[in-house]
Amino acid sequence: MDEFHRCGKEDSFWQQCFLYPLFFQEDLYAISHDHYLDVSSSSRPMEHLSSNDQLSFLTVKRLIGQIRQQNHSIVLFVNCDPNPLADRKKSFYSESVLEALTLVLEVPFSIWSKSSVEGMNESKSFRSIHSIFPFLEDKFPHSNSILDARIPYSIHPEILVRTFRRWIRDAPSLHPLRSVLYEYRNSPDNLQRSIIVVPRVNTRFFLFLWNYYVCECESILFSRLKRSSHSRSLSHGSFPHRTHFHRKIKHIIIFSRRNSLKSIWSLKDPKIHYVRYGERPIIAIKGAHLLVKKCRYYLLIFRQFYFHLWSEPYRVCSHQLSKNCSSSPGYFLRVRMNPILVRTKMLDELFIADLITDEIDPIVPIVPIIGLLATEKFCDISGRPISKLSWTSLTDDDILDRFDQIWRNLFHYYSGSFDRDGLYRIKYILSLSCAKTLACKHKSTIRVVRKELGPELFKKSFSKEREFYSLRFSSKAAARSQRERIWHSDIPQINPLANSWQKIQDLKIENLFDQ
């Protein structure tokens, strides 16, 4: 693939117009075969790999022959395996061909993303997930309204192919993509008859579709916004292989199209902040209520005309930060007024002034967390701990390590909240559930288990947290430490709970509007 990248970088015309010949090269399928084996071997043991998972160049040549025939009545994957593409047990050659197709389509986008990064200051346009929470702290308190706009993940396959035509001029190279999308669309499992583009599908092909789809949505959205308004914006760009970033647009002056010479609507220091975590973007706006309504209307019309998608109004909801709470990512977000006492001294006189500032207040969603723990069989709906029966076959150390890891993840992720008292209830549920699990395994009682283990129960995580805070905060700053929050840098690896809770929140909103 490095050779393909070098060729494309030397000749952009070849990169845009002649991608189709790459499908006829056997080296491409060998690369996809190796990549597929690497992924499959990491997800399943080697003894589970069948003897059929071997590359046959004779079958590859037959596939190439089918591509040359341009016969759309022959499904691309039928001759490889009788199972359809949408089945859970996908055939080996289906995965190999999908890998090859993804590799070919990634060539122009990877070249374009590298050239975009080289030509601009990336630090102004892209931030990692580690800066999302500091971004919320810095920008959200200065905003008065937010737009909670969920990216639509259902799209017609032909519209998705047409969006690819904006980047790739070689029309024949899109025929295999069209065949794959329509086969997935017409599968018996797909009842909506549309392509469900979600980032949770752990395949390279669907991850590429998701990254490309989000890149296309955001690039067109911001280009149209700049075209319809006169804005001084920080440099920004879309990256197909990046999934977490934010942008900032400020000082927007929107011109009326009807009377552009007479009527000019100028917004006094408006600011629009855009942040996206996964498939859930949030737009924070500082300005009049009319600006919020116009932005919401623009998002709905944009999706309708450029992607032919009818977005339900509830998918773009607006509310004020001072009155309502927003949920992302895994927190209840609100802005609260924080009075600060400031003492100033002038001419040997002491003046006391009270200043009121706004700050973001992330709230730990204790009730949803207990609901998720009840779903995972750690407690019941009311929050009473129960034993985890599925873990009774594990060793004592494995059981302790698993409960310890769950608590550490929760504590680290929600350490950015001021009020962490509710986490002690979660700690009680997990510790008692761990004790009940061990008692059920050894056919004993909780009192005997606690007597035998003693401080060993959750010793790792709790001792580390106490040591961490004792080293960070001295005794003189004990009161001040209660008002400080800590964002851990390893939160990207421990957010499945936040994603699950966010999905439940989305389903509740959709069911509310469907009634």
Curated annotation (Swiss-Prot):
| Keyword annotations of the record | Chloroplast, mRNA processing, Plastid, RNA-binding, tRNA processing
Q: Where in the cell is it found?
A: Plastid, Chloroplast
Q: Which GO terms describe its cellular component?
A: chloroplast
Q: One Pfam family, please name it.
A: Intron_maturas2
Give the Gene Ontology MF terms in alphabetical order: RNA binding
GO biological process terms, semicolon-separated: mRNA processing; RNA splicing; tRNA processing
Q: Which InterPro entries match?
A: Domain_X, Maturase_MatK, Maturase_MatK_N
Kindly report the protein's main subcellular placement as a broad class.
plastid
Keyword field contains Chloroplast: yes
Q: Which domain of life is it from?
A: Eukaryota
Q: Any idea what job this protein has? A: Usually encoded in the trnK tRNA gene intron. Probably assists in splicing its own and other chloroplast group II introns.
Similarity field: Belongs to the intron maturase 2 family. MatK subfamily.
Q: What is this protein called?
A: Maturase K
- Its source organism is Pinus rigida (Pitch pine)
Q: What is the lineage of its organism?
A: Eukaryota, Viridiplantae, Streptophyta, Embryophyta, Tracheophyta
